[in-house]
Amino acid sequence: MGESKISASMMCADLINLKDTIKIFEDKGVEYLHIDVMDGEFVPNFGLGVDYIRGLRALTKIPLDLHLMIKDPEYKLQWIGIKETDIVSIHYESTYQVQRALDWLAPFGTGLY
């Protein structure tokens, strides 16, 4: 079994003090920021979206752990701006085109779970 990694969930992060929170995470050695991306279609909730992800990337170099709870992720992945250091989780039941989503992610070398 591999080495454990720390991935801090951003779902309940204080948006007003986000910059300070990110600084604490960086100082404490958090290795990933976990982002629950929800579209209100695959799951009934809405979660953190593309603009939030872009904002986080502007604040830190910490890679993202993207949990995609979205319908048909293979058509939406390009909006997210995935990087080689990110981890991406998709639900197999969120699409009829799982292989297309995997093929789209392959060039990024992302960890896929």
What is each stretch, according to the model?
Residues 1-87, 93-97, 104-110:
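Conserved N-terminal beta1-alpha1 strand-loop-helix module at the mouth
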